[in-house]
Regions:
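Intrinsically disordered, low-complexity Ser/Thr/Pro/Gly-rich regulatory segments
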Residues: 1-211
Length: 211
């Protein structure tokens, strides 16, 4: 693929209608494609077969809301009359729109849970665990991850940078994490599992304000 434009705004006068994430050209077919791309991480609660029960770690986002916006708004940007005018000025014609939603779904630990309807069967998976359930963590080495480390699996990890299960439990015994913490289980320097540790209050989130 050849990148034509990234983060291209679509405007009507002084008003911004939206933004094209990527306009690319397929080198094999010659087609111009509009890509809308999102990378998200969601934790499943209650009936995990329902997209509305998959929440972002900060509880400010939901899987159903994100997919609905992708389908109802972002996928239709190239159909706007203003888009036709923009493409004419740029000398391009958009042939197809692709919606690409990547990321990982984190299932309740030690509980059999269904994947959300419409999810790719081989999607990336993880677990989530409340602070009070930390004793359920498998005895191993764990590495708390910075946000920038959430995307790619880890390799070549120095064991000295990790915490064993007991140290991890001791770290949060009294106060708990202020925000959900993503952790990776490390075996022989390689990541073999990933999950979120959340405080006990997170486990009964109020999602009524998310619409």
């Amino acid at each position: 693929y050849h990148l034509l434009y990234a983060n291209l705004p679509l405007q009507a006068g002084s008003r911004t209608l939206g933004e094209f994430d990527f306009l690319v050209q397929d080198r094999k077919t010659g087609k111009t494609l509009h890509w809308e791309i999102a990378v998200k991480f969601y934790l499943g609660v209650a009936d995990t077969s329902q997209a509305a029960n998959w929440l972002g770690p900060a509880r400010q986002d939901r899987l159903d809301i994100k997919t609905r916006r992708l389908l109802s708004h972002q996928s239709k940007l190239s159909r706007y009359p203003e888009a036709a005018e923009l493409f004419e000025r740029l000398g391009i014609r958009v042939d197809e729109t692709w919606l690409i939603l990547k990321g990982r779904l984190f299932y309740p630990a030690r509980i059999k849970a269904d994947q959300p309807q419409g999810a790719f069967r081989q999607h990336l998976r993880g677990f989530w665990l409340a602070l009070r359930s930390l004793p359920l963590l498998e005895s191993s080495l764990w590495l708390p991850l910075e946000h920038r480390q959430w995307l790619a699996p880890l390799a070549g990890v120095d064991p000295a940078t990790c915490l064993d299960s007991a140290a991890l439990m001791e770290k949060w015994r009294h106060t708990g994490p202020q925000h959900p913490v993503c952790v990776a289980r490390i075996v022989e320097g390689m990541e073999v599992e990933r999950g979120f540790i959340v405080n006990d209050e997170w486990t009964v989130p109020d999602t009524r304000s998310l619409q």
